[in-house]
A protein has these predicted regions:
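Short carbohydrate-recognition loop motifs
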Residues: 79-99
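Active-site-adjacent substrate/metal-binding segments within catalytic domains
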Residues: 256-433, 450-489, 574-580, 584-587
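Glycoside hydrolase catalytic-domain groove-lining segments
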Residues: 584, 588-603, 607-677, 692-696
Length: 774
């Protein structure tokens, strides 16, 4: 093995950013700070730089850290180091920095390496979420960087494989845009799909391990860090191709042309032969202990109400189906025909000539659209653009003119055979209306927003605006919502998705920063008036402000002082005291606003769909105050959890409320797509194992009543409107099931009720938590 040497330089945090990298028609999220060095810092020394010409054949692993590596090879950032007898280094996080961790600094050419492997342990009693960010020489976050995340359970040791993107020829890479992942495994975050300075592993200068500050002072250990060479047989020739050879890169089925993989569709005959193969497979595999709703026929007979409901049975939260059978919602999102839609405007040269990109009056016109619904990245704000639906066109090629009817029928047969029992969010109405498989419904709120707010998917709807409730009423009066409200196969309603709750107090601050007519702002001022009295003088004393009267506060947008000023010892004591009071008031009204949001929705759902469960808002970015309000009003609280497991999840503040996972997934790069999604794995086998581990962990968690995989089919190789192009389907772009994943889905799905029976009660689980914390 080659050993690495380092040149040390001190880095200090300058800023931190919350980076959405989600998905759903959206996303989960990753945290990635910016690190900057002081102006008087010396330039980095290029120690142990490799070049291809100097690289021996075969390439040896490159050791960054092991038992022989001195601790001064690590640059700490608000952590304390301790060398263990094993040679591993234990890092204990401080509480001062937002991003405690440590860095390896130097200069390396990792062009012949495919991944870093870090052996990490968590000796503590709480799960921890670690991140690894790699910077190239020109890095200025988010440009020139790539970030990976790892959740590690208490007492667990993992070998964390951090994939290194391939080094695609620069002039070819320059023509690739509007894609989160690019050929060779090049990845970008949600805010820089088209980074001006892409990450280049040939110019690596920093490897940064860190955690987001959580106030716990977590401990974690690093035993080894090694760069793994790319096997000669896996080195991809297309990485060196010029544009004129590389393009077009997408075949008639929407697949990447320049690689082969097991299951790739190479002809129409292969596409159509899949029908008979799968029909035989589905007929041979059927779970035996399910009723028409997917409820457990071998379980207890409970009260049958004709609708889905929640009940705690033997100390474990359960869903109960309309016939009174125990039900655990094992589902998949986006069951439909549009997962493979991709924009084609300005990218026509990506596609083979036999992909019809413009309408000509023929049958493929149905798969060509003019869209204008991109909310971020390349196509946002550009007006209308052309798109092509590879999923639907492949179904047409596979089934013929009645492709939609046959594909809908196949979806129901697949889900039952695979051991799934729920059609998740954003699925086709034609499939849900068939009343063959339970489903969840979803509605949104189109009312005016809090103008001072912001968010990846848009501003936050103002729950104090009269239109808030009226907008929801109109959504629930729509044809399908009315159908779902009376349909026994409808489990319940999600309202909204991954809206931006911000930090505690943030929406109250946003209200103050809004115009004078903002209803949320006026409600906050009324709340302050009730606390401080009719005379604004008391507020001025508490907040350190000089408002002439309450109308003056309302008249102009007001930027409340940042909460962190309260803890800034460089500030005057009076300023800090005032900032602390402002923060407390903003937190208090934030809770009022959250309760207004959830209570108005609950009241409207009880009015329009009284038989259905309120399944919450599908939290992705959130905070304890928002969750506390949701737990008060939702029948089931929903989260989009992109993690490796959810067995360690607990409701906030010990509130005993059932929860459901609205999204999770895993992906790999061995089936022709360019991005793994938010749960990266090394291979299809590893992906299947990750799926099974996740679902088992949920089944054994007494609060979790279901999980929904995101999503039914792969995204387009060239990306949807926001650039997501993830290998996250249960089926590929040609409607071929991923055999390894489906085997795992069946294995855990067929056994899920038996596994659920092993879950400890909530009380017993909490007692075990307390014992473990001693």
């Amino acid at each position: 093995m080659q050993r690495n040497s380092f040149s040390r330089r001190r880095y200090f945090p300058l800023a931190a950013f919350l980076v959405a990298a989600s998905t759903t028609p959206t996303l989960g999220f990753a945290l990635s700070p910016t690190f900057a060095e002081p102006a008087n810092s010396t330039q980095i020394a290029a120690t142990n730089v490799q070049t291809r010409a100097e690289t021996p054949t075969p390439v040896a692993p490159l050791v960054f850290f092991d038992a022989l590596t001195p601790l001064d090879a690590l640059t700490p950032q608000d952590v304390k180091f301790r060398r263990l007898d094993s040679g591993a280094v234990e890092a204990t996080n401080g509480l001062a920095d937002n991003w405690p961790g440590f860095h390896f600094l130097g200069a390396w050419n990792l062009g012949d390496y495919s991944a870093l492997e870090a052996k990490i342990s968590n000796p503590g009693a709480e799960p921890i979420q670690l991140y690894c960010r790699l910077d190239c020489a020109a890095a200025e976050f988010p440009e020139g960087t790539t970030t990976a995340g790892l959740q590690i359970a208490p007492g667990e040791t993992q070998v964390w494989r951090i994939e290194l993107p391939g080094s695609l020829r620069l002039e070819t890479r320059a023509k690739l845009f509007a894609m989160r992942g690019k050929p060779g495994g090049i990845k970008t975050d949600a805010y820089s799909v088209d980074a001006k300075i892409p990450f280049d592993k040939k110019e690596l200068v920093a490897i940064r391990f860190f955690e987001n500050q959580n106030g716990r002072g977590d401990r974690w250990t690093l035993e080894s860090l090694v760069a793994v060479p790319t096997p000669a047989e896996k080195r991809e020739a297309f990485l060196d191709w010029a544009p004129e050879k590389f393009f077009p890169m997408i075949d008639r089925f929407g697949q990447f042309k320049h690689k082969d993989w097991p299951g790739k569709t190479r002809s129409l005959d292969e596409l159509r032969a899949q029908i008979e193969i799968e029909d035989a497979d589905l007929a041979a595999n059927q779970p035996s202990d399910r009723n028409e709703f997917g409820g457990w026929t071998k379980g207890p007979q409970l009260e049958a109400t004709g609708s889905f409901r929640t009940e705690k049975v033997d100390g474990v939260w359960r869903l109960v189906d309309p016939k009174g059978r125990l039900f655990w919602s094992n589902g998949v999102d986006c069951v439909g025909h549009w997962n493979g839609v991709t924009p084609t405007t300005d990218r026509e040269f990506y596609f083979d000539a036999d992909v019809q990109l413009r309408r000509d009056g023929g049958p493929f016109d149905a798969f060509i659209n003019r869209d204008n619904n991109a909310v971020n990245n390349y196509y946002a704000g550009r007006g209308e653009f052309w798109s092509y639906n590879f999923t639907a066109s492949n179904l047409y090629l596979k089934f013929g003119a009645d492709w939609q009817k046959k594909a809908d029928d196949l979806a129901h047969r697949r889900l039952r055979s695979w051991g799934l029992n729920t059609i998740g969010n954003w699925s086709a109405e034609s499939i849900e209306r068939a009343q063959r498989t339970p489903y969840v419904a979803t509605v949104g709120i189109g009312s005016p927003k809090i103008e001072g707010s912001s968010g990846y998917w848009g501003k936050f709807a103002d729950p104090f605006h009269p239109e808030f409730k009226e907008s929801l009423r109109r959504s629930l009066d729509a044809s399908f919502a009315r159908f779902a409200a009376e349909d026994p196969f409808c489990v319940g309603f999600f309202v909204d998705n991954e809206i931006s709750w911000g930090d505690a107090g943030s929406l109250a601050r946003a209200a103050l920063a809004s115009p004078s007519t903002q209803p949320a702002k006026l409600a906050f001022i009324d709340w302050l008036r009730a606390k401080y009295g009719a005379d604004v003088a008391a507020l001025n004393v508490a907040w350190g402000t000089t408002f002439a009267d309450w109308n003056a506060l309302a008249a102009e947008p007001f930027e409340a002082p940042a909460a962190k000023i309260a803890d800034d010892e460089t500030q005057d004591a009076a300023v800090r005291t005032a900032a602390k009071t402002v923060a407390a008031d903003c937190d208090a009204f934030y809770s009022v606003l959250c309760e207004k949001y959830f209570s108005e929705i609950l009241a409207t759902l009880r009015e329009k769909a009284p038989k259905k469960l309120y399944l919450g808002c599908r939290f992705a970015w959130t905070n304890p105050l928002a969750i506390a309000a949701a737990q008060k009003y939702c029948d089931v609280v929903s989260y989009n959890f992109y993690k490796t497991e959810v067995g360690s999840f607990r409701p906030v503040d010990g509130v005993d409320k059932p929860c459901i996972v609205g999204e999770f997934h895993f992906g790999a790069l061995d089936r022709g797509l360019f991005h793994t999604g938010l749960g990266p794995t090394e291979s299809q086998d590893a992906r299947a194992a990750a799926y099974e581990n996740y679902v088992r962990s949920a089944l054994l968690n007494p609060w979790i009543v279901g999980v929904h995989w995101f999503q039914y089919g792969d995204q387009a190789t060239t990306g949807r409107f926001d650039g997501e192009n993830y290998q996250i389907g249960l089926v590929d772009i040609c409607d071929v099931p991923y055999a390894e994943t489906i085997e795992a889905v069946r294995r855990v799905g067929y056994a899920m009720y038996d596994i659920r029976s092993e879950a400890k009660s909530t009380d017993e689980t909490l007692r075990a938590d307390r014992e473990a914390a001693k």
